[in-house]
């Protein structure tokens, strides 16, 4: 299984993650060209080789016109206001709605936009909790800067390019002490970072500084499936993303890209099932909650008709998610449904090793989802690709589907 491992012994920040992932890709110039043309006026992203404690790595530098952007939490707020095609970045205060509008207009894939927005939702929820206000009232400070947006979008672009089947991270070193932000000096980890990192293993060691920023924490929480020591894997590439500050220990986030193997005789996955009974919500309200949970990255959400006390017709809402995200989804369910309690069940799951192939057909490119394991091989064309191809070519769904199934490449036949 293609696996990405993040070693967070010196924490995590957006620029460190971008640099560490960039070292894993073959065409670095192509990424720089892409990130510099996403549609943020005046944005310039450069990579530079640096050496810390005798180890060579990459540092990402972001500039906006004449100002140099900093991705760490204590960055100075840039004073420039950029306007282009109705896209405006006011660096001192940027609302979540404005962040949504900015990302929606960027020249990146929809998958990158969705991932970036999900990361910002994690940050917005954390900031709202820390300040005791609603998400709608949140005004980002440094995190609303164009350089912070570039960090988050850059990581999403690189993750789409690398396409790991599984992403694992070590426990995260958060640092200690206090850090200066727009509201004054706050403890490390910051309230927002601490909120995001709930249910994730963290520790403090080696530095009296902030090592994990809200941006770094949110990116990791969004993409990482498991938190543990490095698994048994055949490493193919290693990346070093260097931080700005110098410490006694090398200030870097290290990435490993390689292959891991699961024994077909063992259970290879663990998930959490969150459930509650609902008998006093409208269908529209339940549908809204389901869409929100799926939008935030739940693995699956569904309802089953049930009958409750006093013979009331009701639904059983089930949300399936990764174990480390259970607290996050439980809070969403409590906030957006009428339930007073949620049942949590930890489930071991048998899962096939998955990957995605792309097939060229008469109707365009179609992605094919494949699964292998337990002496079983399966493949299935992606519904969205077939539906879009059918619409664009004015043919039936079955015609496109048959074209994929009846003309498999040699690689697909082996699956």
Swiss-Prot record:
Tell me which Gene3D superfamilies the record gives: Transcriptional regulatory protein pf0864 domain like (3.30.70.1380)
Keyword Membrane (UniProt): no
**Top-level taxon in the UniProt lineage:** Bacteria
* Keyword Protease in record: no
Record-level Gene Ontology MF annotations: lyase activity; nickel cation binding
> Keywords of this protein's UniProt record, alphabetized?
Nickel
Q: What InterPro entries does the entry give?
A: Ni_insertion
Q: Which family does it belong to?
A: Belongs to the LarC family.
Q: What is this protein called?
A: Putative nickel insertion protein
The source organism is: Endomicrobium trichonymphae
> What lineage is on file?
Bacteria, Pseudomonadati, Elusimicrobiota, Endomicrobiia, Endomicrobiales
